Amino acid sequence: MQSNFIFATLLVLLSLLTFTYASGSSSMTSSSMPMFGGAIVAAFAFAIFSRLAQNFAPRAIFSLLPYHSVSC
């Protein structure tokens, strides 16, 4: 569980760093750089969302079911 927390924290920090890079690159002369930075931000946001969904979705689904319907 500790490694998942560290991994999620690193993903958040990297996404913030890429967001800063993407917002700062809009002043560059190349028109493809802001789009590239936005794609990086979207990829990191999707990675964070999928990691959170992978961790919390099974618990959330089984918590909605009645206890007697869950068989192990």
Swiss-Prot record:
Compartments where located: Membrane
Membrane-side (Cytoplasmic) residue stretches: 50-72
Membrane topology: Single-pass membrane protein
Cleaved signal peptide residues: 1-22
Spans within the Extracellular topological domain: 23-28
Main location class: membrane
Disulphide bonds in the chain: none
Transmembrane parts of this sequence: 29-49
Annotated keywords: Membrane, Signal, Transmembrane, Transmembrane helix
GO cellular component: membrane
Protein name: Putative uncharacterized transmembrane protein DDB_G0287329
Naturally occurring in which organism (per UniProt): Dictyostelium discoideum (Social amoeba)
